[in-house]
Amino acid sequence: MFVTSGAGSKAEMSAYMGAYAASKAALDALARTYAAETATTSSVRVMVANPGPLRTNMRAALMPGEDPMILHTPEDFAPKVVAMCAPEWTETGRFYDFQNGGVKSFRAPA
């Protein structure tokens, strides 16, 4: 389970967050590669999840004028992560978008 961010694929969202955006872009590339490497050789499942904007201290520091009450909390996101880590989860090599509530193919790199 890899937790990513839109900052890894959208430079316009990442002003003043270069190191963070670069780390998430690298994480996305690593996950795509690992999924391809293990797709037919292992029972390892690889999922990438983007929680989108969450009510965190980091978000509050970056967006000081934003109303935190309009955002989901990490506790809202956690059950989805737990579900994707459970033995019953069968998908691999996919991307989960928490804000839109869907699993899809990995997005193309920016």
Residue positions per predicted region:
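Catalytic loop of short-chain dehydrogenase/reductase
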Residues: M1-T40, P53
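Short, well-ordered secondary-structure micro-motifs
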Residues: M13-S14, R59, A108
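Short linear motifs at secondary-structure transitions and domain/linker junctions
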Residues: A22-D28, M58-A61, I70-T73
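C-terminal helical subdomain
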Residues: V44, V48-A49, T56, P64-A110
